[in-house]
Curated annotation (Swiss-Prot):
The gene is LECRK72. The chain crosses the membrane at residues 291-311. The keyword Transferase applies. Residues 1-23 form the signal peptide. SUPFAM superfamilies: Concanavalin A-like lectins/glucanases (SSF49899), Protein kinase-like (PK-like) (SSF56112). This is Probable L-type lectin-domain containing receptor kinase VII.2. Keywords: ATP-binding, Cell membrane, Glycoprotein, Kinase, Lectin, Membrane, Nucleotide-binding, Receptor, Serine/threonine-protein kinase, Signal, Transferase, Transmembrane, Transmembrane helix.
Length: 681
């Protein structure tokens, strides 16, 4: 039976076996090319966007798309190397044709297709070599045909194959959900819908998981079994995808793909939203009775569209001359919402629709085009409007192009003269983490708190490393981390975010921006933000979530100093939220790990703090990746070593107190107090 122990054992085995390797890592986000992909048979790259298409309507054909060069799949001792791969795929039959066969993710000792057959053999084997132990082929099949000769369980299954199409394990395609991971939902493989798959092999066991694209990775794998691939994965192997057609045909598409020998979080780097859809529509227009009339209507429609375009161009030119359209609008985020529509959506920014406030802004719930949205209204005086507009442009230029499952999406924007600037976000039904910890009857349980920490780490990793330009958030705190309807955490409120070229280390400011208790010592002293100051804020957030205590509370020791003190006494677990202790449902090892991660991140020396990539790997695997190589390391040793923890009171004195911040000459008017989030947003 599946249990959390299974995940713990799998992660522990990964920790023990993931030594420093000469493996590779790559990410294809709808950017397949004939250069970065080896195309065989009927496989092609279709663009735009650049996706890998394995098959077409040709009967009895094979299509393969492989990484262009061999990779090392075993160590010097002949032990198979661990790997993690994730990809987004779509399978769909062609209109008016019966569906065909599936496809497989594969490791092959060769690239050519001469030793493979089409149809039910998926372009992997033929009638003679299927089952041959010398084939040295490993695959995970996604099949939509029930072949009795291979003992297929049904016509919609996922299977793990070793040298044979008779799977060593197979399950109906789908995922496990619910709070206990016991609710199974079947996913129809050949519906044309986009699905994401995760395949993780730690050297002795394999996990296979799938879900709808843009959904969170299910905690419980679809398939989780011990697996010995010694003698199967060789020194030099090809890796990629294969599919075939027979008398029956259908399309097999790979939209995105990531692979790594060392990073189990590689799947988080895939863009899962705004992908092309291949779902089948109704009957073909070519066979409809109104086809001829439709062509005539189409000509009329084309003329109408041309007329509308001309009207649009003239109107835009007039607006630009009148100063209503900013020069940057089209480039960064073209979806401007009319102010009158925003007024209607929020009922005139009524108090009953207000769900949050902070600084010079308020957040309202609204309904635009039938969908709930969160509307952030930033008020300003005429004197402030120029500077505020610049910050507004920074936010639009950042959020308008960022796409990640753990970042709140920007839906549009608006403004009213120099009085107010307006941002329209996705609505987060479950409000802020701040609210769910301190001001809500439905308090976050331990499992949900760990998920929130992992989600925020994933979102911050994307901001720091996952885009062409580094993005500094500059105000990470519990009220800026929001929860969607599925309780997934997302980073919100980019009002203080700055774009940073990767060639530069820091962004200088003339005053401190941030929130008391979350600001790194060097930020308070110099006003200079960096990725390390974001990491510090993340560390404070982790301590806050685990302890159920705000960073600064009147009459109490600051949370950072308090947890450092508990660490010195070897009682760090005593910092756990008393309400969680009373509930009794928590994992001591996870509590200890989370608090130590928090302490790593809030170290007063920014050079000692980990990068967000390292934080993500600690959370996923309990290990650190050092610059220049990977090695196992004890978190306890790292936190308690003399390198990290200076003895006596000297260490604590390096952390800024509330008074330090208040007395800072750079504090001025930019100091932010806690935002209050009353409801979901």
């Amino acid at each position: 039976m599946f249990s959390k122990v299974s995940i713990l054992l799998f992660s522990l085995a990964s920790l023990l076996l993931f030594r420093s390797t000469t493996g590779i890592e790559f990410i294809y986000n709808s950017n397949f090319t004939t250069t970065n992909t080896l195309l065989l048979g009927n496989a092609t790259v279709k663009s735009p966007p650049s996706i890998l298409t394995l098959t077409n309507q040709t009967t009895f054909s094979i299509g393969r798309g492989l990484y262009p060069s061999r990779i090392n799949a075993s160590s010097s001792s002949a032990s198979p190397l661990p790997f993690a791969t994730s990809f987004i795929f779509s399978m769909a039959p062609f209109k008016h044709l019966s569906p065909g066969h599936g496809f497989a993710f594969v490791f092959l000792p060769f690239s050519e297709t001469s030793a493979a057959s089409s149809s039910q053999h998926l372009g992997l084997f033929n009638f003679t070599n299927n089952g041959d132990p010398n084939s040295r082929i490993f695959a995970v099949e996604f099949d939509v045909f029930a072949n009795q000769e291979f003992n297929d369980i049904n016509d919609n299954h996922v299977g793990v194959d070793v040298n044979s199409l008779t799977s060593v394990a197979s399950e109906t395609a789908g995922f496990y959900g619910g709070r206990d991971g016991q609710r199974f939902t079947e996913l129809k493989l050949n519906s044309g819908e986009n699905y994401q798959a995760w395949i993780e092999f730690n050297g002795s066991a394999i996990n296979v998981t799938m879900a709808r694209a843009s959904s969170r990775k299910p905690i419980r794998p679809l398939i989780s079994i011990p697996l010995n691939l010694t003698g199967v994965l060789l020194d030099d192997m090809f890796v990629g995808f294969t599919a075939s057609t027979g008398q029956l045909v259908q399309s097999h598409r790979i939209l995105s793909w990531s692979f790594s020998n060392s990073n189990f979080s590689i799947g988080d780097a895939l863009i899962t939203r705004n992908l092309p859809s291949f779902k089948l529509s109704g009957d073909s227009v070519l066979k409809s009775k109104g086809f001829i009339a439709g062509v005539s209507s189409g000509v009329v429609l084309l003329v109408s569209v041309i007329g509308l375009l001309c009207f649009y161009v003239v109107r835009r030119r007039r607006q630009r001359l009148e100063g209503d359209v900013e020069d940057w609008e089209t480039e960064y985020w073209p979806h401007r919402v009319q102010y009158k529509d925003v007024l209607e959506a929020t009922k005139g920014f009524s108090d009953e629709n207000m769900i949050g406030y902070g600084g010079n802004s308020k957040v309202y719930r609204g309904v635009l085009e039938g969908k709930e949205v969160a509307v952030k209204r930033i008020m300003m005086s005429p004197r402030e409007s120029v500077g505020a507009t610049s910050e507004f442009l920074a936010e639009v230029s950042s959020l308008g192009r960022l796409r990640h499952k753990n970042i709140v999406g920007l839906k549009g924007w608006s403004k009213k003269g120099g009085e107010s600037l307006i941002l329209i976000y996705e609505y987060m039904e479950n409000g802020s983490v701040d609210k769910r910890i301190f001001d809500c009857n439905e308090m976050l349980n331990w499992e949900e708190r760990m998920r929130v920490i992992r989600d925020l780490a994933s979102g911050m990793l994307y901001l720091h490393e996952g885009w062409e330009t580094k993005v500094l958030h500059r105000d990470i705190k519990s009220s800026n981390v929001l929860l969607d309807k599925d309780m997934n955490a997302r980073v919100g409120d980019f009002g203080l975010a700055k774009l940073q070229n990767t060639s530069k280390e820091m962004v200088s400011t003339t005053h401190v921006v941030g929130t008391a208790g979350y600001m790194a010592p060097e930020l308070v002293k110099t006003g200079r933000a960096s990725a390390q100051t974001d990491v510090y804020s993340f560390g404070v957030f982790v301590l806050e979530v685990v302890c159920g205590r705000r960073p600064i509370e009147e009459g109490r020791e600051g949370i950072v100093e308090w947890i450092w003190g508990l660490m010195e006494k070897d009682k760090v677990v005593d910092g756990l939220d008393e309400r969680i202790k009373a509930n009794g449902v928590f994992v001591v090892e996870e509590v200890e790990m989370a608090l130590r991660i928090g302490l790593l991140c809030v170290h007063p020396d920014p050079r000692v703090r980990p990068k967000m990539r390292q934080v993500v790997q600690i959370l996923e695997q309990g290990r650190l990746v050092e610059d220049g190589g990977e090695r196992e390391i004890s978190l306890l040793e790292r936190v308690k070593s003399s390198y990290l923890l200076e003895t006596g009171e000297g260490s604590r004195q390096q952390h800024p107190t509330f008074q330090d911040v208040w007395n800072s000459s750079s504090y001025s008017n930019s100091f932010q107090t806690y935002d209050s989030i009353l409801h979901g947003r």
